[in-house]
Amino acid sequence: IGLMLPYTPLHHVLLSDLTHTQNCMEKKKALPALVMTSGNMSSEPIALGNREAMERLSDIADIFLYHNRDILVRTDDSVLRVNPTSGDPLFMRRARGFTPEPVFLADKGPVVLGVGPELKCTVTLTKGDQAFPSQHIGNVANLETMEFHQELLAHMEKTLQVKPELIVRDLHPDYMTSERAETLGSERSIPVAILQHHYAHIHAVLAENQFTDPAIGFALDGTGLGEDGTIWGGECLLVIPEDLSHQRLAHFSHIPLPGGEAAVREPWRIAQAALREIGITSPGTYRWPWLDEFSRESAFLPKILEKRINTPLTSSCGRLFDAVAALCGLANTITYEGQAAIRLEKIQDMTETHAYPCPLMSHEPIALNTHELIRGVTEDLDAGVPVPIVARRFHLGLITGLVDMAYSFSLILDIHHVALSGGVMQNLTLATELPIALEQAGLVPLVHKKVPPNDACISLGQAAWGQRKLLLEHP
């Protein structure tokens, strides 16, 4: 259920016909249903004016309500969840009503621009001890959204009356934001620095909390190019803001992605690949849910995995959720990002207390053995355990494994603060129960409260890191 507050008188006019709601309730009639969507095509920015709306939206809209007040800046509606334990907001999208409110930093510094990632992109400019994350831009994968990116940056520079001394971009060279950063740096003769995706996540949550001491960071998301060329996403990182040193301490067990991007759209591929990693190549008593729909493709998958044809490895926490959801029969395929993980979160039997094992493997490189979570899920499904119980045991096992890993590194490094970031931290179970479990282990969690934990926070992490970099280079 989504709750929307009217922010213009126009909303009252549009909804005036619903004033009979009380009568409907009294007469036991069906209440009217409203479907809300923003004024844009998928993956494109919101239409800015009447003419643009007519050109871009006439195929999907039957009626246009014009207004004589021009829109100067595109701004989506903000989307939040509420942490039921703490009451704190958990941003999914930070835009209308919250931007351009600044995030206050620990120190004053020079002006830095963080151009953001490719998905859920924002840009951030720093000014003194303040960082200004922009409103939601979207997925920067087409010309229209890239133009909005440039348009918004120009607007922010004019509003704040600043020009960046450093531009920070993602490690991935093919992101349109990375290409734009290099072009902008060349045009303005500004240096461009590179910060890996998941370190940017951790620097974002540290900056938001004005925390400058060393911290252990969990960056849990879907994808990001790692320093070793593989796809990261289930990372335990050491970050030292004082001198900007960092280290990858551990990661989730690798899972192959047969078909690359196709595996993201079809989680059954990830599930079957994960099963093969633990030695399971055929169904047990539990029939794999995807066999009816994808029996032919499933038969070819072992050969693709064996020859590693278009099959990158990932340590992604998001892909782990996808695999488990597919195993549970919740999503063979998806039509929107996070669909499989959302279903897995929602179906949990919250009365269940048993957790699957998720041990830390001490060999180099150190890994959290998330393959054991897959094994636990498979064994329970074979034994006929209901999916809601399986889903809950998976969540509890992951939380237990993360806490054990954090505690182990805390003892080794004498560091007690644990920063939590990444799109998986939008999962309300992890967002509420993981910080509590860390506190019970004697650790101090640092979480997002002012910006989303998803990739929308990347530009903040880039900008805060870049500002510290300039301060170190020019004390």
Task: Pin down the residues of each PLM region.
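Short glycine-aspartate micro-motif
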Residues: 34, 112-114, 168, 215-219, ...
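Conserved phosphate/anionic-ligand binding catalytic regions in large, soluble enzymes, centered on
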Residues: 33-45, 172, 221-231, 308-331, ...
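Conserved phosphate-binding/catalytic loops in two-lobed NTP-binding clefts
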Residues: 170, 189-201, 416-421, 428, ...
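Active-site-adjacent structural elements in enzyme catalytic cores
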Residues: 1-168, 172-187
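Short beta-strand scaffold segments in enzyme catalytic cores
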Residues: 77-81, 121-126, 218, 234-238, ...
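Glycine-rich phosphate-binding/hydrolytic loop that grips phosphoryl groups
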Residues: 198-220, 224-226, 267-276, 395, ...
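Short beta-alpha connecting loops at secondary-structure transitions
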Residues: 247-261, 285-286, 305-309, 443-449
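A contiguous, well-structured pocket-lining segment that forms one wall/lid of small-molecule binding clefts
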Residues: 117-147, 151-155, 179, 273-415, ...
